[in-house]
Amino acid sequence: MTHAEIAEAKTDTAVRQAEYDNQRAIVFQQIQEGLIRANAARRLVDLYRNTLRPQAEATLKATAAAYQADRTDFLNLLDSQNMSLDVDISYFRALAEYQSRMAELERAVGAPLAAPEVKQ
């Protein structure tokens, strides 16, 4: 091998190493961002499951009991029902968002992840 060929091989190796390092940094950034988004989506699912849905259900039950006791009108009962349904819809949207974020994270990692189970 001549000096020119050796120099060219070293340059080619350095270029390939830089490309590898750049791609690795991009993937690492995608993983970090994916993890942040997945964790945020998971926290939202937990908020709906542990707080908002039970509150909406309790409000609906209380309003239904008040309606049966003739202490509130039918419109309030319908409003409580709509609120409960809206919370349920938002919960399932948040759950779908979480699952989508986990799928994105798996694509970035390149392997299936053992995500914590999210109960419906």
Where are these regions (language model features)?
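Terminal intrinsically disordered/low-complexity segments used for targeting and assembly
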Residues: 106-120
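Amphipathic alpha-helical coiled-coil segments
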Residues: 4-90, 97-108
